[in-house]
Structures are given as structure tokens and as C-alpha cells.
């Protein structure tokens, strides 16, 4: 059974994910259909960032996955050399 702290952290992560999903969905799908002079546009970044931010996040994810795999492979090679 998860502790209270684990449940709170999990709930917080889900809440943040839902907020980001709602914001991004509104930004990308609904905002182009709203008049550009409407006051809601001041709460969103320019549309170019709708592509650049996920692209940057994806590249960072690939970078960290690659670094992790490299670290694990190098560490396992050191352990293999010690055993021999």
C-alpha cells in the first residue's frame, strides 16, 4: 500500500499533467478559431512555441535516455572487467 506522501505526490503529478494537457489543448486546438483581438490570447504564448516547446522537450528526453543507456552500458563493462 502506498504511503500518504506517495499518494500526495502522485495526485500532484496527475493534477499538473491535467493542467498542462488542458492548457496545451486549448492553445493548439481552440485558440486558432478565436478572434485574434480577443482578450484570451494574452494568456498564451505565440503559436510558434506550440511546436518548439514539445520539440525541445522531446530532444531533452532523448538526450537523457541516451545518457542513461550510455551510463548503464559503461558501468556494466567495468563490472565485467573486474570479474575477469
Curated annotation (Swiss-Prot):
Pathway: Protein modification; protein glycosylation. InterPro entries: DPM2. One of its GO terms (cellular component) is glycosylphosphatidylinositol-N-acetylglucosaminyltransferase (GPI-GnT) complex. GO terms for molecular function: dolichyl-phosphate beta-D-mannosyltransferase activity; enzyme activator activity; enzyme regulator activity. One of its GO terms (biological process) is regulation of protein stability. Regulates the biosynthesis of dolichol phosphate-mannose. Regulatory subunit of the dolichol-phosphate mannose (DPM) synthase complex; essential for the ER localization and stable expression of DPM1. Part of the glycosylphosphatidylinositol-N-acetylglucosaminyltransferase (GPI-GnT) complex that catalyzes the transfer of N-acetylglucosamine from UDP-N-acetylglucosamine to phosphatidylinositol and participates in the first step of GPI biosynthesis. May act by regulating the GPI-GNT complex. This is Dolichol phosphate-mannose biosynthesis regulatory protein. It comes from Rattus norvegicus. The lineage of its organism: Eukaryota, Metazoa, Chordata, Craniata, Vertebrata.
Amino acid at each position: 500500500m502506498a504511503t500518504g506522501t506517495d499518494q500526495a505526490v502522485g495526485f500532484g503529478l496527475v493534477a499538473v499533467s491535467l493542467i498542462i494537457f488542458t492548457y496545451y489543448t486549448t492553445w493548439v486546438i481552440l485558440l486558432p478559431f478565436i478572434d485574434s483581438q480577443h482578450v484570451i490570447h494574452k494568456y498564451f504564448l505565440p503559436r510558434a512555441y506550440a511546436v518548439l516547446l514539445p520539440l525541445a522537450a522531446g530532444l531533452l528526453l532523448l538526450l537523457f535516455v541516451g545518457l542513461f543507456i550510455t551510463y548503464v552500458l559503461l558501468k556494466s563493462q567495468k563490472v565485467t572487467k573486474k570479474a575477469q
